[in-house]
């Protein structure tokens, strides 16, 4: 049997160990889980549960999205996090030999009628929580209403363009 003073000490030590263990386990559970292994068609790359493909033949924003829709659940890419932005930027930098911006699935169907550039959304209907504007469209005197990855930012920031401009594009789809 433990002396009466030993039991509170032992309880305190046990409680401290349990608290430390829960913190360590909590840190591990917050890390991103490894992506599911998916098979993507030739010419595309997997990231998490989607396939991504860069198309070098320039098209208007609408024609590019129509081309992307030929793939299962396909649209111009929606960039939902900084990690996904880095993946897409790397895909573009490693496969494109032109000095061009790249269409993404961001657009403003209100054509600027909502205050503070509030009309911007993803064509895929994903929620626009992550933003990476090179220059806020609300600060531009004559903005375009379709989004692109900016070459000058290493494809890590967004820029608005006239939707009828012909640019290469990235599709995001399932397969």
From Swiss-Prot:
Cleaved to give an A chain and a B chain joined by a disulfide bond. It comes from Bos taurus. The gene is PTP. GO terms for cellular component: extracellular space. Residues 27-37 form a propeptide. SUPFAM superfamilies: C-type lectin-like. One of its GO terms (molecular function) is signaling receptor activity. Keywords: Disulfide bond, Lectin, Secreted, Signal. Residues 38-173 form the C-type lectin domain. This is Lithostathine.
